[in-house]
């Protein structure tokens, strides 16, 4: 409130201090802005320093593992699913001089299950013993597979695994050991309904080539399905399963193998002989319950000096591949 002299009298007037408030607000905002900018700059600098320090630690780890190697010592023979390996998977960690490295942390990746035909894996953190070795024997499994276990230098949790140089360095030091677990078709056996077709697409015979290859791979209890009429080709699998189940039941044989072997490309004359392509479509069915346990397809191209030689070579290569899929996939 101010008193202003006007026409010889003091008049009381109320004065609003907008300008003062505005100037105060501007000063306050300016101060706040300066503080924020200072803090932001400080935070960015801090992040940059931390980032540099983090990569420095990763580079140090990369340098450390550059001087080591993980080598395979022993891989046990394949087993049938449901059984344990008779010996351990064994490896050793060595330094640049070839000496064993004790208490070295290693990550082990190994198969633990199969879902819809796809292998799933788990990991373990292990340390080398005093002699630099690692021994591992997985529990018996309920699935078959032909895959690998992997051993890599264990990355400390404090490091950033998204750093590309780190993952590349670890990958370069990874050891893969083959792990093979056979299907129980080896001891349970199977009946075969796999018809070979000629170049005109007509079924000719239940595949003796495949039957022989299964026997050669240890499947002693194997024979043609008691119900093998070609009229079942292309029909629902349940009809073929039911017809054979009525004859042999669900325990005499472990599996019913159903499928076809057809010419994808007929025998063709080429400069140095003949060539053809065959394709096999195979389904494995559990005789106990009729469930499909394997679906696989293999295509093969081969050559030969004449028609018979070409087809024979192609059938041989094809059945070798398809039987391997059955042994390690059923």
Segments the model singles out, each with a brief description of its role:
Residues 77-106, 136-138:
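Beta-strand-rich structural segments
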Residues 128-138:
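Glycine-centered loop-to-beta-strand initiation motif
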Residues 285-329:
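Short secondary-structure boundary motifs at beta->alpha junctions and helix caps
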Residues 160-193:
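Short beta-strand elements
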Residues 186-258:
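N-terminal segment of the mature soluble domain
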Residues 85, 107-125:
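Short amphipathic beta-strand segments in non-cytosolic proteins
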Residues 35-36, 238-289:
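Surface-exposed short loop/turn segments
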Residues 30-33:
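C-terminal motif of bacterial Sec signal peptides marking the signal peptidase cleavage site
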